[in-house]
């Protein structure tokens, strides 16, 4: 009799997880409509003819704000599980979270002083 251990279950799960996206992409490739010609390749802007080119350069300040946002968004992702389990973790986890927040505050002050958050 064949007995499955934990590794066989994991490999089966990995195989299925790899197979599902491949099958989905293959099915969409086979079932999609064929090329509709040059009209289908044009840009659609609410039924109007597009004005100007589609390739414009954004100001670098947008990227700086986006980078600062991502840093603090990741902070939220790390602090949420800590806040949920706050009662069970104890004082050491509280000190670690304070150190983590302090590092991010120092980074925010640094970005502020360097002018990364100024729009002028």
Swiss-Prot record:
Keyword annotations: Membrane, NAD, NADP, Plastoquinone, Quinone, Thylakoid, Translocase, Transmembrane, Transmembrane helix, Transport
Membrane topology reported for the UniProt record: Multi-pass membrane protein
GO biological process, one term: photosynthesis, light reaction
Family as reported in the entry's similarity comment: Belongs to the complex I subunit 3 family.
Function noted in UniProt: NDH-1 shuttles electrons from an unknown electron donor, via FMN and iron-sulfur (Fe-S) centers, to quinones in the respiratory and/or the photosynthetic chain. The immediate electron acceptor for the enzyme in this species is believed to be plastoquinone. Couples the redox reaction to proton translocation, and thus conserves the redox energy in a proton gradient. Cyanobacterial NDH-1 also plays a role in inorganic carbon-concentration.
Subunit structure as annotated in this protein's UniProt entry: NDH-1 can be composed of about 15 different subunits; different subcomplexes with different compositions have been identified which probably have different functions.
Protein's name according to its UniProt entry: NAD(P)H-quinone oxidoreductase subunit 3
Protein encoded by which gene: ndhC
């Amino acid at each position: 009799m064949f007995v499955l251990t934990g590794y066989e279950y994991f490999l089966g799960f990995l195989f299925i997880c790899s197979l599902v996206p491949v099958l989905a992409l293959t099915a969409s490739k086979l079932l999609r409509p064929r090329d509709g010609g040059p009209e289908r390749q044009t840009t659609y802007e609410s039924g109007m003819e597009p004005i100007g080119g589609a390739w414009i350069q954004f100001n670098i300040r947008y990227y700086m704000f986006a980078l600062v946002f991502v840093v603090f968004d990741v902070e939220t992702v790390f602090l949420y599980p800590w806040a949920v389990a706050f009662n069970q973790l104890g004082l050491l986890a509280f000190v670690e979270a304070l150190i983590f927040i302090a590092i991010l505050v120092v980074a925010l002050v640094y970005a502020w002083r360097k002018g990364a958050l100024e729009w002028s």
